[in-house]
Amino acid sequence: MTAVAQKIIENLKMQDEVRSSDIDAPYSEIHGALISLESRGICNVKMEESYEEVLTPEGEEVERSGSQEYLLLESIGEDGMSIEELERHSLGKMNAFRNKWIRREGNRVFRNVESIEDTVRNMVISMKRGTASAEEVEALRKRKLVSRRKKIVFIATKGPMFFDNTSYVTELTSEMVLDGSYRDLSFKHYNFNAEGNAPQCGSIHPLMKIREDFRRIFIELGFSEMATNQYVESSFWNFDALFQPQNHPSRDAHDTFFLLNPELSTDFPSDYLKEVGETHRGGKYNSLGYMSNWDIKEAQKNILRTHTTSVSARNLYRLAKKEFKPAKLFSIDKVFRNETVDATHLAEFHQVEGLVVGKGLNLTHLMGILREFFNRLGMGDIRFKPAFNPYTEPSMEVFGYHKGMDRWIEVGNSGVFRPEMLRPMGFDSDVSVVAWGLSLERPAMIKYGLKNIRELVGHKVDIEFSRKSEICFFD
């Protein structure tokens, strides 16, 4: 039995309870002793949580030297202070000007008062003594001189085996077995409910946890998942099959990653390729098209897909070649954009896409599906805004109200696929397809409270973030 455990027992003999805060020993030793005593039934242990206000490093500096405004005033001589030197006292400068303790004349700053009482330092000292008022503590917290810290205290009381002085053996050795001494010993019982150390093994990335929850929502709604294992795509399936003009800005090298090797694709359905080209050039199916030249070499260029709608186009083409049957499909996978990397944008991200194939589907059906889908994501309050997409008409942007940010944010894009996209595939004129898409990273950042996307994806992600992040369910 350790010295700390013995001290706890001695204290319990004289009083009803012992608090860990009253024991002069390291936290780890106290905690270990309490666990050992509780496992043997000698004492019962409960945990009490509380919060206390403590000085931050900045607060401790104010306690030692004084507040920034006080130090600023003390450093201004009779000939004043230069503006350059004043800039080194950013916080003190603001408070001194606000209280009219200093004034500016030309390029120098002068005192308005000879001296001041350092009330901030006085509040810090009162806080440390425990005599500060709630208003004073709040004022110090706003200046980041005080922070709130969780305090955990363990309370031990006598257990059912407190008066049992039996010395328990924790390990059975070969010598005990050979000489038979184990028969006269009392062995400590195993606690099979005790938690062991977490193994240092691989962890599921938080983004993958979110992806699995998206998959669950789609599957619960009766959707089937499309295969998305083709990152390299031809411009034909990525752009042309979607009725996106060849002079569209998104097809420029500033927005798209083009492959050098292999540079071109040649494997296209010939009849479908011809239909798409004619629809672009002069229009078909009651459309004028783009009334411009359509170059097959432009369609052959290989790229890193810019959206998973290219996957949708391939699957819709296969569906059009079969006997008509309504379908609900979805995909979640990586896409690539040649964008400037910042706090909210990466050159690669995950796109979530869903589509419904049926007869007579219109904007009303799409809005109903979207309300149900986003409601399951925990975004019951959504709004729609008219938008433009080359391959959907009508098109809508979807906005959700984010309570934490207290504003409406764009959460997705949607629309009804144009006949110029569907008819060349072979669909009849009464077949409609409604679709929508959104990124996976944005809701993940919201759920995990992240402000910088590089904290979620990339080489700067903290490994502990992956190990300790809980699964965020959308409800």
Swiss-Prot record:
Binding site for Mg(2+): 393
Listed Pfam families: PheRS_DBD3 (PF18553), tRNA-synt_2d (PF01409)
Subunit record text: Tetramer of two alpha and two beta subunits.
Keyword Ion transport among UniProt keywords: no
EC number(s) on file: 6.1.1.20
Principal subcellular localisation of the protein: cytoplasm
MF terms in GO: ATP binding; magnesium ion binding; phenylalanine-tRNA ligase activity; tRNA binding
Protein's name according to its UniProt entry: Probable phenylalanine--tRNA ligase alpha subunit
Entry-linked NCBIfam families: pheS, PRK04172.1
Gene Ontology CC, one term: cytosol
Key words of the record: Aminoacyl-tRNA synthetase, ATP-binding, Cytoplasm, Ligase, Magnesium, Metal-binding, Nucleotide-binding, Protein biosynthesis
Subcellular localization(s) per the UniProt record: Cytoplasm
GO annotation terms (biological process): phenylalanyl-tRNA aminoacylation
Binding site residues for L-phenylalanine: 309, 351-353, 391, 417
Region spans: Contains the major tRNA-Phe binding sites: 2-151
Catalytic activity reported: tRNA(Phe) + L-phenylalanine + ATP = L-phenylalanyl-tRNA(Phe) + AMP + diphosphate + H(+)
Reported cofactor(s): Mg(2+)
Superkingdom of the organism of origin: Eukaryota
UniProt xrefs under PROSITE patterns: AA_TRNA_LIGASE_II
InterPro entries associated with the record: aa-tRNA-synth_II, aa-tRNA-synth_II/BPL/LPL, Phe-tRNA-synth_IIc_asu, Phenylalanyl-tRNA_Synthase, PheRS_DBD3
Family: Belongs to the class-II aminoacyl-tRNA synthetase family. Phe-tRNA synthetase alpha subunit type 2 subfamily.
EC top class named in words: ligase
